[in-house]
């Protein structure tokens, strides 16, 4: 499955990295330093057990027009930048792309719905935690369940996302 990420900070890195175990992962990040680090050395994650893992997505770019449509797009960008990031990433979101928000805060769904049809939107919560240690480097600080659902779409979208997450090692 082709999975895109909107933002590759602390949490985006945890999810993007782990999902490379089972999927093609593509990253859009507005920060060139993040893209350069991920493309050069991969995503480095310091795990809670003390181990360090490195994952290699297909590409990290500041130009999403080079990527194409995704099966799933996972949003981790800060709310303040959400609208402009979604506008830039329209080429990654096709008529069958499921857009999942795992962002903190409220109001994300409404912002996403300005750009994406509501039937394509999933929202979720996660008990995972992370700290950003630098471009492409995160410390995984907490592990737990990730819950996904839809507001207007059918449960099939949420099931597809949950399957993709499980394949990457998330519960």
Region spans (language model):
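Internal alpha-helical scaffold of NAD(P)-dependent oxidoreductase catalytic cores
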Residues: 92, 115-120, 133-171
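Residues at the C-termini of beta-strands that transition into short coil/loop
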Residues: 29, 49, 62-64, 103, ...
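Short, charged/polar "capping" segments at the starts of alpha-helices
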Residues: 34-37, 109-110, 156
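Conserved beta-strand segments of alpha/beta enzyme cores
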Residues: 24, 44, 59, 120-122, ...
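Rossmann-like NAD(P)(H) cofactor-binding subdomain of soluble oxidoreductases
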Residues: 53-56, 61-137
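NAD(P)+-binding Rossmann beta1-loop-alpha1 motif at the extreme N-terminus of oxidoreductases
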Residues: 1-48
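Nucleotide donor/acceptor-binding cores
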Residues: 1, 71, 144
């Amino acid at each position: 499955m082709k999975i895109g990420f909107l933002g590759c900070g602390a949490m985006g890195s945890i999810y993007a990295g782990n999902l490379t175990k089972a999927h093609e992962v593509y990253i859009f990040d507005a920060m060139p330093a993040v893209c350069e680090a991920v493309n050069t050395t991969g995503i480095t994650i310091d795990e809670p057990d003390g181990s360090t893992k490195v994952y290699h997505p297909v590409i990290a770019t500041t130009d999403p027009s080079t990527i194409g449509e995704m099966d799933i797009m996972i949003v981790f960008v800060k709310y303040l930048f959400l609208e402009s990031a979604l506008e830039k990433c329209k080429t990654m979101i096709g008529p069958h792309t499921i857009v999942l928000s795992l962002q903190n805060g409220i109001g994300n769904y409404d912002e996403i719905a300005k750009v994406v049809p509501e039937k394509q939107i999933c929202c979720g919560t996660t008990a995972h935690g992370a700290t950003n240690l630098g471009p492409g480097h995160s410390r995984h600080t907490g592990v737990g369940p990730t819950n996904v659902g839809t507001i207007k779409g059918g449960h099939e979208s949420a099931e597809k996302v949950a399957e993709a997450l499980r394949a990457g090692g998330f519960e």
